[in-house]
Amino acid sequence: MAADQRPLAIAVMGPTASGKTALAIEAAQRWGGEIVSVDSALVYRGLDIGAAKPDAAMRAAVPHHLLDLRDPWQVYSAAEFAADARTAMAQIVARGKIPILAGGTGLYFRAALEGLAQMPEADPAVRLAIAAEAEQVGWGALHAQLARIDPVAAARIHATDRQRIQRALEVYRISGKPISYWQTRPAGPRAPVRVLKLVLAPRQRAVLHARIAMRLDVMLADGFLTEVEQLRALPQMRAVAAPLDLPAVRAVGYRQAWEYLDGAGSLAESRDKAVQATRQLAKRQLTWLRGELDARWFDPERDRGQLEQAVAGFLGQRRTMQQPSAV
């Protein structure tokens, strides 16, 4: 079998608050790379503090791609991400640099590296109609509707998973075929790069939970609520009938802050809900990552040497990297 001649890339994966951003920036500086963000919140303009978006200094230190692609009232699909990510990777390689994919959105990683089954594109009007229907009858009723239309998909989608219920119904209403049909169709071509997958994950869950809580408190101190107030004040956001169903507002932390500003509970309760929602997100991310059988796992604080050796061996170089911090 011929050797794989595709250019090399590194994927820095892991649950939220595990230190991916810091490691990706450090690796890019050390090995000559550019960062491709793999995060479904960072594609939205205005989601900065609450999404831990790399700041101006970080972007000045290392080129970043796929940030601020859409306004918060717009929709951005995994298929769009796959196309944009592959374009970015090709451009980075053409410049003689190493693409470093970094983030925590598993669907985006899969779309960029493995391809997605061909599926109807998102239709904002259909999504809004489904959201309006959910306001009337509830998402549980829409999940029951999905079970009648597509029992295979309904069995895989939890009755409280609004985003996936909405997408499954949207696909059916657009195409007349259930989403499970589309998911069995052949995926796109493989990625134009050969990837080393690195998973950053503290071995002790308590460590990750502490990082999550600490990061949220820092975000609140840095003005997260003011950021959400500014989003709410945008005329285009005020015109949306069900803003809580927008993908941008569904981002962890933003929903809880939005509901607090709507008058639901105290700030302390909102903070605790956001911490809990972020823990649940981290749990889902870890579950998905365990299915990445070709990924190599590292504790960001304990496995310094092994992480360095993995990168150096993959890239054919032997150099040291500075200790990444939790970002």
From Swiss-Prot:
<keyword id="KW-0819">tRNA processing</keyword>
<keyword id="KW-0067">ATP-binding</keyword>
<keyword id="KW-0460">Magnesium</keyword>
<dbReference type="GO" id="GO:0006400">
    <property type="term" value="P:tRNA modification"/>
</dbReference>
<keyword id="KW-0808">Transferase</keyword>
<comment type="subunit">
    <text>Monomer.</text>
</comment>
<feature type="binding site">
    <location>
        <begin position="16"/>
        <end position="21"/>
    </location>
    <ligand>
        <name>substrate</name>
    </ligand>
</feature>
<dbReference type="InterPro" id="IPR018022">
    <property type="entry name" value="IPT"/>
</dbReference>
<feature type="site" description="Interaction with substrate tRNA">
    <location>
        <position position="105"/>
    </location>
</feature>
<dbReference type="GO" id="GO:0005524">
    <property type="term" value="F:ATP binding"/>
</dbReference>
<feature type="region of interest" description="Interaction with substrate tRNA">
    <location>
        <begin position="39"/>
        <end position="42"/>
    </location>
</feature>
<dbReference type="GO" id="GO:0052381">
    <property type="term" value="F:tRNA dimethylallyltransferase activity"/>
</dbReference>
<feature type="site" description="Interaction with substrate tRNA">
    <location>
        <position position="127"/>
    </location>
</feature>
<comment type="similarity">
    <text>Belongs to the IPP transferase family.</text>
</comment>
<keyword id="KW-0547">Nucleotide-binding</keyword>
<protein>
    <recommendedName>
        <fullName>tRNA dimethylallyltransferase</fullName>
        <ecNumber>2.5.1.75</ecNumber>
    </recommendedName>
</protein>
<feature type="region of interest" description="Interaction with substrate tRNA">
    <location>
        <begin position="163"/>
        <end position="167"/>
    </location>
</feature>
<dbReference type="InterPro" id="IPR039657">
    <property type="entry name" value="Dimethylallyltransferase"/>
</dbReference>
<feature type="binding site">
    <location>
        <begin position="14"/>
        <end position="21"/>
    </location>
    <ligand>
        <name>ATP</name>
    </ligand>
</feature>
<dbReference type="Pfam" id="PF01715">
    <property type="entry name" value="IPPT"/>
</dbReference>
<dbReference type="InterPro" id="IPR027417">
    <property type="entry name" value="P-loop_NTPase"/>
</dbReference>
<comment type="function">
    <text>Catalyzes the transfer of a dimethylallyl group onto the adenine at position 37 in tRNAs that read codons beginning with uridine, leading to the formation of N6-(dimethylallyl)adenosine (i(6)A).</text>
</comment>
